[in-house]
Amino acid sequence: ELNFYKDQLKDKVIYCNCDDPSESAFTDFFKLNFDYLGIKKLICTRYQKSNLFTYADPVRRSGYRLEITAKNKNDKKPVKINLKEDGDFRSPECIELLKEADIVVTNPPFSLFREYIELLVKYNRQFIIVAPDSALHYKDIFKLIKSNKLWLGYGRVKEFIQSDGTIKKMGNVGWVTNL
């Protein structure tokens, strides 16, 4: 899907704010195609869920960000920068990164999809994101489609590679964008 947007991605700061950079196919794709796409910078943030063990340790409780630029794009292990907070896309720290971004590319949590789109619209960000088909029927999402502020991408998400290397089949997921 992303190859269809090569011209729009050129010289842009791309933000993947809902994908663990150590496991994300988006991170891998942008790192491998950094020069081909001509992107300026890639920012990825990781959400760190709180649990009994991470809550007691402030370092383990925080999420992290990964930034890839022309200078470090070939590094085998780019530097992970700890966030002050947990890396939730709604946190003030991640919203500041969102403001820096030109285009957001991610697979947001479907349970928070309305809230996620609302944030992108509020900050006037361009995006290419994975979405459940059911979201197209949400009243607030349908208004965006009707007013030509959001439309379907070129393709469908039929399957994706999970962090353990297995392939998960999908049948009800597609791309939405405002590019």
Question: Positions of the model-derived regions?
Answer:
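Class I S-adenosyl-L-methionine-dependent methyltransferase catalytic core
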Residues: 1-179
